[in-house]
Amino acid sequence: MHSLCKPVKLYLFVLITSLTAIIPGCIVPKKYQQNKPFVYSTNINIQGNLPVSEKADLKLKLENQLDDSLKTVLKTVFPGIRFLVKPPVFDTAAALRSVIFMNNLLHAQGYYKSTITWDSSITIKEKQQRASVNFTVVPGKSYKFDSVNYRLQDSALQMLALSRRNGSLLKKGQPYSVDIISAEMDRLVELFRNNGYYKFSRDDLNAERDTVFSALINPSLDPFEQLRLLQQARSRQQNPVMNVTIQLRNPDAVSHFRKYYIRNVNIYPDLGLLDDSASAPKYDSVTVNGIHIFSRYNKFKPEFIASKSSLQPGSLFRLRNSARTYTNFTQLNTFIQVTIEMIELQDSSARVDAVIKMYPSVKQDLSVTADASYNTGDIIATGDLFGVGLNFGLNNHNVAKQAIQSSTNLRTGVEVNLGSNFIQTFQTSLSHSYTFPRLIVPDFILRHIKTDSLRTQRTLLNFNGAYTDRKDFYSLKSLNVSLAYQATKSRRLRKSHTWYFSPLNVEYVLLNPRDQLKLLLDSVPNLQFSFNTGLVISSILGYNYIQTGTDGAKKNDFRIGLEESGGLTGMIKTLDRDANLYRFVKIDADFKHYINYKKSALVFRLYGGIGVPYGRDKDGVREQQLPFFKSFYAGGPYSMRAWQVRQLGIGSSPYFDTAVNARNVDRFGDIQLEGNIEYRFNLGTLFNVVKLKSALFTDIGNIWYRTTQGNPKYIGADFNINKLYTDIAVGAGTSLRADFDYFLIRFDWAYKLKDPVYSNDNYGWFHDVQLLKGQFQLGINYPF
């Protein structure tokens, strides 16, 4: 088997390296007009002292302003080979139009003193007249906002705008941009519509811009004052500014400046695709808290439907209540479509009727899926392991007519050793879960939670049982029961806060060791603290913050989790009769930063975690390590890819790599630090079906014991900040990825650039790095 793997790995390495090397590739013109110059390339060069990121952003915007006759269409038929399909005939008029378009954009971005020049050249190659067009852009100094005022000719609107002025997007000294002015007017429209002004729209606002002092043209002004203002205006030539005043476009449109109220709220919760709300008399009608519910199939409880509506009869119209109602229903995962319509009454009462139409999805569905895994050695097997599994799932999307989600899953699978002892592992598991679309807590707690500000709120109840039989080593039975709450707050579309709290998480593991495992535990005593029968009764607290940039180009994702087991429950003696209750505290944090470009992306990740066990075994000996299913590990397709799964570490201790009985043993630690950098880019499309992608990556990190208790076997395995550089491992490699839209397959190839096991030799840098001695990883979807 190993002789077969070598040529496969060599092939993958050569393939990935070759594809990466030819990314620039060649361009082959197709279907161009003969004997006429055609547009082969168009380049934009921006000059000036602009920051690199700002210059790149401006260049992208300018490229979008090019005339269509200067834009080329490149189609990748295979990595490195791109066809220039039907390139347009070069026309100087297109270049002149592009200059006008780009100047308009620069003015919109505050560059009123910009200059644009262009030139072209024609290269003859194989009877092709290839025209290259080059634009040189000198933006000059950009204008900045000076004074920003509201002059709304309606006292109520003016007062409301001034009361929320702190939220204005226009700030004095900020670079001028039409986009920012537009965003500020959108903010005002949203503010007004959230305060009853149902008919108010963007067309009702106008932004007046002024780059000169209006006082200079005032004939009644004192001459000395005019002279002072003139000198001030001249000084501003060096630092140009813009005054902005936002006002009503048509103050006479009085109907747009009236507050509207909601008369009726009519909800149709179970419409069929061919049903029409106009047939309402045929439906059963129920009124709950003034809300009219028209049901034909009686699929939902009226009280439940009414509780999800933030639109209430007699209340002031607020756009956010309409949006919140829409979110409340769509987040249930029970409806395939939800629409909300406001119907204005044809009288002078300034009222609307809210009509909510919902189309439920199929109540139950059954799924059957298969999965496969590949692993090169683990704690008790040294061969190549291949696993196959079969999954059966039954989902109910509307339990008890309250959109409660239930899911039942049965999985069974085997893991075979391709080298010997064919069937290595047999595993089966059964899980059942409920997801309630609300927080099920006592009223005295619920009163202190502002549920109206939450975008989603869920209560999660999970049950899971599993049986694993590892040939010659052990049989393992496990049971898990948990209760959890999850809530997401997202007042702004680009920012979300998600909290997760599990007050009760029970995990029981019953281990029946066999002779081979006992021999292994004798060789590696530390594993005895991890591999035994045990009980976890813990509470888990988690928080996740996601922020996306205004243009979607940047994204931050931060997650932190805390778990504690055995603190309070350890006081109940019956739960710890045989000292099987695990006591520990564990915390971990994960931060990811994404920078997306047009055809590539940069991703940075930092991860860190620590677990502190504080229990004692039945002999009174203090536990040294976390249970294996709560420990940290590194290596594999999702962590430190230059190492096999759970084969990195521990620290710089050579014990696990040199001791005969410890080789290939899984490494579990109490502390983990890891950092990753990945540059992702597109290669092209294969047969117009599969999107081929690639990546260059670097992984940095390791795992450690919190303490070794002075055991000489594990010198270098404990964490010490003073030897962090010595202990850190560094791996780097490349990847070939096939993106099928719904999932992505990764073929990663990585090298150990710094192996802490050999820290005595140049800190382990480039120890035995050879072309074919890399590590292959097969992964599904992105590593992070």
Residue ranges with predicted function:
Residues 394, 729-737:
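Short glycine-rich, acidic/polar surface loops and turns
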Residues 22-25:
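C-terminal motif of bacterial Sec signal peptides marking the signal peptidase cleavage site
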Residues 373-384, 498-691, 696-723, 762-765, ...:
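C-terminal outer-membrane beta-barrel translocator/porin domains of Gram-negative envelope proteins
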Residues 2-12:
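Bacterial N-terminal signal peptides that target proteins for export
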Residues 27-331, 448:
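Interaction-mediating elements
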Residues 157-162, 298-299, 318-559, 641-642, ...:
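Gram-negative/organellar outer-membrane beta-barrel architecture
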Residues 11-19:
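Sec-dependent N-terminal signal peptides
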Residues 46-48, 137-141, 152-154, 246-250, ...:
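Flexible glycine-/small-residue-rich
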